[in-house]
């Protein structure tokens, strides 16, 4: 464990690499949010009524019949040898909540879970992310995305139930 003293006069320069790391993280969040907003059900209607940046307590409560979704980053991993001054892996989370009677909510959550796992596996939009910036050639920043964890949890809510569906994704940065 490293102890760090905070000096009120301390400032740091934002170097181009720090700004680039921020852009990569921001682009991954925007990419995930856009992908989740574009998912549709069997009737070609939007799957989620709302997609939020960051963890939101309201998501646990659910909003009506359609699920709500949160996307956020939880961790950035750097290479062990410290040769590269940028993250090698970024971990993100996607959380969705459904509400209804217990059987109905759980069946819908299981269907949503299966559907999202299938989308992560087969939809190319979830696999790689290319960065488009002005005056810069197109470059791929996420080479691979994989699901590292998926969880479903029942949350009693008065007379009805909420079912939380959560995914942890690991993005390999090039």
PLM region spans:
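Long, charged/polar, surface-exposed segments that mediate recognition or autoinhibition
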Residues: 94, 98-117, 121
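Acidic-leaning, charged glycine-interspersed low-complexity segments
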Residues: 38-40, 51, 64-69, 111-172
């Amino acid at each position: 464990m490293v102890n760090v003293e905070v000096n009120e006069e301390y400032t740091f320069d934002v170097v181009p690499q720090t700004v680039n790391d921020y852009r990569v993280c921001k682009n991954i969040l925007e990419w995930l949010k856009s992908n989740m907003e574009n998912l549709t059900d069997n009737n070609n209607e939007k799957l989620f009524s709302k997609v939020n940046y960051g963890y939101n307590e309201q998501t646990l409560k659910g909003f009506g019949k359609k699920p709500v979704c949160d996307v956020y980053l939880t961790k950035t991993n750097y290479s062990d040898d410290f040769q590269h001054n940028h993250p090698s892996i970024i971990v993100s989370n996607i959380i969705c909540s459904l509400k209804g009677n217990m059987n109905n909510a759980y069946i819908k959550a299981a269907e949503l879970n299966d559907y999202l796992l299938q989308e992560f596996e087969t939809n190319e939009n979830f696999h790689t992310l290319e960065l488009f910036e002005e005056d810069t050639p197109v470059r791929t920043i996420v080479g691979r995305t994989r699901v590292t964890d998926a969880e479903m949890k029942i949350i009693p809510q008065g007379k009805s139930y909420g079912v939380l569906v959560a995914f942890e994704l690991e993005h390999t940065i090039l």
